């Protein structure tokens, strides 16, 4: 039986392979640690980060409770959508980075969908 880490890595590589086929759009990449959530919009053709948001930002960090929860994921999603809109990005590819589309990842994606299409 495979360990959880191997399943995660396999899922991550499968997602990245599918995303690499759509190289004409920017990539919304998500990373989640035990304490924080990070979101970046990356241009893979130029290898640069266009916009970034996380629970470490001063606007989101004001709440002293747990940083990695659904409420903060919604705030990060809205913040990354606002930064993408100001940068003129309307359409991205969602890279969930091997995480299952559930809970915190789903909340962040739904909040980002208000201004970004993916």
Swiss-Prot record:
It comes from the Bacteria. Signal peptide: none annotated. This is one of the proteins that bind and probably mediate the attachment of the 5S RNA into the large ribosomal subunit, where it forms part of the central protuberance. One of its GO terms (cellular component) is cytosolic large ribosomal subunit. Part of the 50S ribosomal subunit; part of the 5S rRNA/L5/L18/L25 subcomplex. Contacts the 5S and 23S rRNAs. It holds the Pfam family Ribosomal_L18p. The gene is rplR. InterPro entries: Ribosomal_uL18_bac-type, Ribosomal_uL18_bac/euk. It comes from Rickettsia prowazekii (strain Madrid E). This is Large ribosomal subunit protein uL18. Keywords: Ribonucleoprotein, Ribosomal protein, RNA-binding, rRNA-binding. GO terms for molecular function: 5S rRNA binding; structural constituent of ribosome. One of its GO terms (biological process) is translation. NCBIfam families: L18_bact. Belongs to the universal ribosomal protein uL18 family. Gene3D superfamilies: 3.30.420.100.
